[in-house]
Amino acid sequence: MTHAIEVRGLSKSFRADRKALDDVTLHIAPGEMVALLGASGSGKSTLLRHVAGFITGDAGAGEILVNGRHVQRNGRLARNVRKVRGEIGFVFQQFNLVGRLPVITNVLVGTLARVPKWRSLLRIFKADEVQGGLDALAQVGIDDYAFQRASTLSGGQQQRAAIARTLVQNASVILADEPIASLDPESSRRVMSLLRQINRTRKVAVLVSLHQVDVAMRYCPRVVALRHGKVVYDGPSAALTPGMLRDLYGTEADELLLDSVPDEDVSTAAMPAPAMVTMNLAAA
């Protein structure tokens, strides 16, 4: 089977004495929704940026494929990385919209990878492309704001506009980097529900970084947990308990729990054995 995302033995060092990513391997199937869980500084954003081809890993250390095509290998970007990036939608924590431009123009940026270069430079869009952008905004519930400046939208609305951009891009993979970190609870719920809806209806693979365990358990059937750049857990979100998280993270578990999950272990005696669980307590 061709995986939507495949990471093999990826390492990244920003300093000689510390690895931001340490021999990370993971596979995500088409149509899967996976939470990338970890405390601040665990390597979540760094991993997502590697998958998107924004940065490269250490020389001679690993490879990344999206839909069977290389993004990077042994610390070098693939020659066709621009085409592969066209299949990847990226949702940033700070929305990455141009505030002075209309919302619809920000959304239509998602089409630029597949239009002639002169049109992408001049940002000239055809009528059917504009209609596609309006349809995408309708799907995320903010089509009434299409011709307003992006800066006039609330944080939650801006994040939904960013998700609409991935829809017009027709991305088969969505990477979302802490998409709810700066949002209020209701906006957070809407954004996560929207990502789940896109995952289910479009069969898009979604990898979303989070630091809230309760959100990961509510929206993502599978969790990949990082600590100090290492994968310390890969398995069903339903199998995670506060006790297990404290075993994996120690005092860092408090940042993940945030009193949002009852501080008690769920008995595993009655819980069916997870189909796939990888734990690395040595890395923790």
Swiss-Prot record:
Subcellular localization(s) per the UniProt record: Cell inner membrane
Subunit structure: The complex is composed of two ATP-binding proteins (PhnC), two transmembrane proteins (PhnE) and a solute-binding protein (PhnD).
CDD domains registered for this protein in UniProt: ABC_PhnC_transporter
Gene symbol of the encoding locus: phnC2
Binding site for ATP: 38-45
Location (main, coarse): membrane
Enzyme Commission number(s) from the entry: 7.3.2.2
Organism phylogeny: Bacteria, Pseudomonadati, Pseudomonadota, Betaproteobacteria, Burkholderiales
UniProt GO cellular component terms: plasma membrane
PANTHER family assigned: AMINO ACID IMPORT ATP-BINDING PROTEIN (PTHR43166), PHOSPHONATES IMPORT ATP-BINDING PROTEIN PHNC (PTHR43166:SF6)
Single annotated GO MF: ATP binding
Family classification: Belongs to the ABC transporter superfamily. Phosphonates importer (TC 3.A.1.9.1) family.
Name the UniProt record assigns to this protein: Phosphonates import ATP-binding protein PhnC 2
Membrane topology value: Peripheral membrane protein
